[in-house]
Structure formats: C-alpha cells, structure tokens
Amino acid sequence: MSILNNKEVIVIIDAWSGGKHLIPAFQALGYFCLHVQSTFLPEVFIADNQLAIARSDRHIVHDGNIETLLSQLQPYTIKAILAGSEGAVGLADCLNDALELTFSNQFELSAARRNKYLMQEQLALKGVASINQQLAGHSDELKQWLAGHAHWPVVLKPIQSAGTDGVFICHDLAQALQAFEAILAKKDFFGSPNREVLCQEFLAGEEFVVNGIACQGEYFFTELWQSKKQQRNGFPVYETQYLHYQNDAGFDVLTAYTVQVCQTLGINNGAFHAEVMMTSGGPVLIEIGARVAGGADPYIIEECLGHSQISKLAQAVLHPAKFLQECRRQHDFSGHRRAAYVYMISPSPGRVQVSPEEKFIKIDGVISINYHYAPGDIQQETCDLLSSPGVIIAIRDNPALLKQTIAEIRDVEADFYHLGLIDE
C-alpha cells in the first residue's frame, strides 16, 4: 500500500555529530526528512552518515553540482534547509539563497561564517571585539607578523576546520615555524588543502561555549559550557566542560556579546555554536559555527533545563511565533541540575585489553559513556579533541556532587590506563 502526501519537507545536510539528532526530531513531529550528503565524508563521520541514510525518508549524495542538486530538490515543498555539521554550512547557505527560503542567514556573509580569518575581520570592521591576526602563505609572512606582534604564545591553525584539528599553541619562533609547516603539509578536517595558515594572538582567560538558536533576528540561548583545557605537546586538549546557565556568573555579558557576533555575521535564523574567551578586557570570539553543537547530547540539556538546541531549533522552524514569545519571556532557572562532559585524555598509545565502560557507568551521576575503541584496538595518544578516546557525561543535583563524580571518573580513568592498556 502506498501513501501520497504533500507535506512540507525538512532538508538536512550532513546530519552528523550533534546534527544526527535532527532527522528523528523532525520526523517525530510528522515531517518528511530529506538528507543530503555533501561531497566529502570525513572518516570519523562514516557511522553517523550510515545512520542518516537509514533514518532519512530520502538520501541524496551531492556530486558538487549545485544545479543538479537543485533539480533533485525541485519536486519537494521545502520548509527549511539546515546544516547538520560544520562542513554543510556553505552548501546550506547556497541552497537557501537559490530557493529564497525565509529561514536562512544573510548570504553575503556566508564566507565569513566559515572562514575563520574573514570571521574576525568582519567583527573588527564593525567594531566588535576580535582577535589580532594575520594570514600567512609563506614563512616570511609569519616571521614578519610575529616580529610586529611581539607577544607569546600565539595560535596557529587552519582557516577552515573543526574541533581542535590542526590548532597549535606556540611559545617561540621555532615552534611557530614547525606548526606552520605541519599545517600546510596536511589537509583540513574536510579534505581541503591548507594553502594559508591563520596566525592569531593567544587569548588568556576563561573559555566558554555559547549555544543557541536564532529566529528572525532574535536569539534564545539554550546553554553555556565553561571549557577547561590542558596543553599537551603544544596542542589544546579538552579536559572538562561544565554546564552554565542564566543564574550563573557571566551569562548576561557572554550572551549580549554573542548577540553582537551573530548580528555582525548575519546569523538571523538557525542554530549557532560559539566559542568565546572571557578575557580581562571582556568577551572575545574564538570562532562560531552556524549549526548545532558538535557531539552534543540533547538529553543532557533537556534533563537539566527542559529544552535543548535540537528542540528549540525545531520550534523556531515550525512555530516561529511561539519561539519568539518564549524568547521574550522571563524564565527562572535557579537551582537547575548540573552537568559536565568529562573528556578522556590518553597519555600514550596502547592496546585495549578490556573496555572501561562498565566501571564508569557504576559511578553515581554518570549517565553515559561514549568510548571509541574495542578490545584489541590500538588506543591513540590524545593530542586534540578528535583523538580523545571517549567522553563521559555526568549529571548531579549540585556543583559539589558533580565535582565528586568527576574526581571518581578520573580515578577510574587512571586505573584503566594503568591496567587496561598494553604499551605499544
């Protein structure tokens, strides 16, 4: 028996990482979901892409020809086109512009939302706090900027990438030149060659992730995360992220600044995921993505705050009037539950003897473990976010209990590295 309908369609491009939750979220509300796979599929997202193929009502593999893709979309009445991960942002902008969809961002600023150099230049142009930087395609350009900048450390990274891929913190000229050559010698996370390197001042302070949803130029902040990192061999490595919200210190300053950033970069509709450093002089953007947060589990925020980036994005797309009404309403989140992402940090490579999940899940407050290896695999040394062997998520009723849970997680992790791995 066949079923015919004229339902509006939600198009999701690269429903990977945090975006993998978008297809079931819209389908649960009765919407037909069409998934577009862009031209490059990073190896780390192969499993997520297979999940998107299985879940979606139709799957299209984009061959790089926009006109062909538009013709494939032509039979559908499209409600919205959404980027499911960072590499999809540019394609989503192109399709939204071609189809003149209203739930979209300012097309003229599309490049500034993806290119980290142009992003900071646009902020500086509009007088919004930004990073001192230089684009270098040759080592002489790097040396010239470093001589003029005259402050250490500095940050070198690709112009377009994801996570902490290819991000170096350099403390002297030798380290900077080595990082420069290392970045140029490899492709970025999305398979494009690095032909120039972004050189930036190092921001000292407390780092925050600021997540939210835009709708018709108004903004709802779903959650903030305070990020604790450590440096390993010149690389920034995530250690722990702590949930913050409206009643926590710094919320108003961080969100007011992020509104400025979104407005300056033309983020008027859809999800955004910003990394902001709270410096002694105030908040400064590290970078922002016009998409849902990568790797995020909406359960955590729903459990602690009663909403998530996924649920609020669906509301903004489907019921904008209700979304805007809730943006303007005062909410009391005092006493909200506390949560943390605890990232495993592997000190050295080793062959996995036994997986650690069962020991982690027994700790009070641990709700999930995402461990990336199986017995017999070689667990890699952690040098960035993508090489962390796993993440443990914890929820407790107050900060003291959460601190206790995190300490127990680190104890179990240390035992695992000592007893569960064989040196390679």
Curated annotation (Swiss-Prot):
Keyword set, alphabetical order: Antibiotic biosynthesis, ATP-binding, Ligase, Magnesium, Manganese, Metal-binding, Nucleotide-binding
Sites where the protein binds ATP: 147-209
Cofactor: Mg(2+); Mn(2+)
GO molecular function, one term: ligase activity
Pathway: Antibiotic biosynthesis
ATP-grasp domain ranges (all copies): 120-318
Cofactor annotation remark: Binds 1 magnesium or manganese ion per subunit.
Keyword Cytoplasm: no
Ligand binding (Mg(2+)): E275, E287
Enzyme class: ligase
GO biological process: antibiotic biosynthetic process
Residue ranges that the Swiss-Prot or TrEMBL entry lists as coiled coil: none
InterPro entries for this protein: ATP-dep_AA_Ligase (IPR052032), ATP-grasp (IPR011761), Dapdiamide_Synthase (IPR053699)
Domain of life: Bacteria
Disulfide topology: none
Enzyme Commission number(s) of this protein: 6.3.2.47
Pfam families, sorted: ATP-grasp_4
Catalytic activity: 3-[[[(2R,3R)-3-carboxyoxiran-2-yl]carbonyl]amino]-L-alanine + L-valine + ATP = dapdiamide E + ADP + phosphate + H(+); N(3)-fumaramoyl-(S)-2,3-diaminopropanoate + L-valine + ATP = dapdiamide A + ADP + phosphate + H(+); N(3)-fumaramoyl-(S)-2,3-diaminopropanoate + L-isoleucine + ATP = dapdiamide B + ADP + phosphate + H(+); N(3)-fumaramoyl-(S)-2,3-diaminopropanoate + L-leucine + ATP = dapdiamide C + ADP + phosphate + H(+)
General function of this protein: Involved in dapdiamide antibiotics biosynthesis. Ligates N-beta-fumaramoyl-DAP and valine, isoleucine or leucine to form dapdiamides A, B or C, respectively. Also ligates N-beta-epoxysuccinamoyl-DAP and valine to form dapdiamide E.
Protein name in UniProt: Dapdiamide A synthase
Originating species: Enterobacter agglomerans
Lineage: Bacteria, Pseudomonadati, Pseudomonadota, Gammaproteobacteria, Enterobacterales
